[in-house]
Amino acid sequence: MAALLQCISHSPMKGYVDPSPAIVSDVEVAIARMRKELVDFDPEVIFLFAPDHYNGFFLDVMPQFCVGIAATSVGDYRTTPGPINVPREIARSCAEHLISNDIDVAISYRMQVDHGMVQPLEELMGGLNAYPVVPLFVNGVAPPLISIRRARLFGAAVGEYAKKLNKRCLFIGSGGLSHNPPVPQIDTATEEFAEFLIAGRNPSPERRAARQQRTKDAAIRFAAGDSQLHPINSVWDEAFMADLVNQDWGALDAYRNSEITEQAGISTHEAKSWVAAHAAMNAATSGGYMAEVRYYKAIPEWIVGYGAMAGSAEQAT
């Protein structure tokens, strides 16, 4: 089989609270290079690992992993709303493979996804329906959280399934890197916000707009240095990406959730989507691939350590 790997950060603040034009241009150049590689590769199926931010998954029932048999974008932060082109039989077969191999995934015939999944679709392939996409939710924001090891095993099982398809498969990881946006935790939230975290599906346009405005205000304060949010940790980000480049699965398995939160911020756990994508690539190619860092910069305006990585089996020597 032929396989391609792409991992990229996302931020809802893109286009709302931007860094300097030079930084925006550098990010766009990195994305354009990855977009061209995707188009040239022409994937027959995409496996997209991504988190959610209390737009589709809530604490009434919060799975650690979920395979979307059908999925729709909620259209938050000016992302495109509407159905995603999910190859239903492949998605269902993938879920069956995972469950039969001791990965206890949930499935959804009505998955709702937000910018965490939609931004890479828009930026790398121009929209929701350009290619068949199997959406793979990885819980990255709602404790209790899986370990990096479990994310790796999940991704590896997806990669083993993809290998059997004998198709051109693209593995995308969306999320991270270090960041701690203003998302209340259930234990400290007000009663009203706790109810939202539990059952906040399909909010009114006014309520969604108010929530998004709070995030914009927080980004402005964070960029100005007037914020109590956890700082971006470039040292952590670069060490994490180096472990991925080196395929140092032992080092990655040794990461502890408490240390990730303390060193890099609670939402850094989104980076487990990158681990899953790399593990899928590793399994699909039997380790015969190489990955490289394409871009990294701490971007406070976007409240994130923003990174991009890519890899292909053809690069391996």
UniProtKB/Swiss-Prot annotation:
Principal EC category: oxidoreductase
* Keywords linked to the UniProt accession: Aromatic hydrocarbons catabolism, Dioxygenase, Iron, Oxidoreductase
| GO BP, sorted A to Z | 3-phenylpropionate catabolic process
Q: Which cofactor does it need?
A: Fe(2+)
- Recorded superkingdom: Bacteria
State a single Pfam family of this protein: LigB
Instruction: List the InterPro entries hit by this protein, alphabetically.
Output: DHPP/DHXA_dioxygenase, Xdiol_dOase_suB
Listed GO MF terms: 3-carboxyethylcatechol 2,3-dioxygenase activity; ferrous iron binding
Instruction: List the active-site residues.
Output: 115, 179
| Pathway noted in the entry | Aromatic compound metabolism; 3-phenylpropanoate degradation
- What's the Enzyme Commission number for this chain? 1.13.11.16
The protein's annotated catalytic reaction(s) are: 3-(2,3-dihydroxyphenyl)propanoate + O2 = (2Z,4E)-2-hydroxy-6-oxonona-2,4-dienedioate + H(+); (2E)-3-(2,3-dihydroxyphenyl)prop-2-enoate + O2 = (2Z,4E,7E)-2-hydroxy-6-oxonona-2,4,7-trienedioate + H(+)
Q: Family per UniProt? A: Belongs to the LigB/MhpB extradiol dioxygenase family.
Under the subunit heading, UniProt states: Homotetramer.
Function (record text): Catalyzes the non-heme iron(II)-dependent oxidative cleavage of 2,3-dihydroxyphenylpropionic acid and 2,3-dihydroxicinnamic acid into 2-hydroxy-6-ketononadienedioate and 2-hydroxy-6-ketononatrienedioate, respectively.
- This chain's protein is named 2,3-dihydroxyphenylpropionate/2,3-dihydroxicinnamic acid 1,2-dioxygenase 2
| Lineage, opening ranks | Bacteria, Pseudomonadati, Pseudomonadota, Betaproteobacteria, Rhodocyclales
